[in-house]
Amino acid sequence: MPDVRPEVLFVCVHNAGRSQMAAALLSRLGGDAVVVRSAGTAPADTINPAVVAAMAEIGIDLASSGATPKKLTDDAVRASDVVVTMGCGDECPFYPGKRYEDWQLDDPAGRGIDAVRPIRDEIERRIRGLLAELGVSAVTP
């Protein structure tokens, strides 16, 4: 039987902040009901330390989860049902028939944890809305 879980791809420029937080939050809240990926158009070497710290505050351990910035590929876009972009503009590939959303969010690059927390919280709010739109019940962490 084919896998009918929705596949969601989060894309930002460096795949070191917003898209990493979104992927981790969707994985946590969507559980096994969704397939989650993240990527960047120009990936950084490491995830932003303030992002790692902000996620640790809510019990998500990016440091030991194996999460690393990854390069956006055409295959990742083709495999996804929903592509959520976060500040990559025209650098993100477009394929007809895919559902695209562009989330306007502040970039946490170079910012401290106090600036990252509200970005994290806004991403979580949007993730909960996306789950509802996909017909997936959020898992209680």
Set out the residue ranges of the language-model regions.
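Short polar/charged helix/loop
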Residues: 1-141
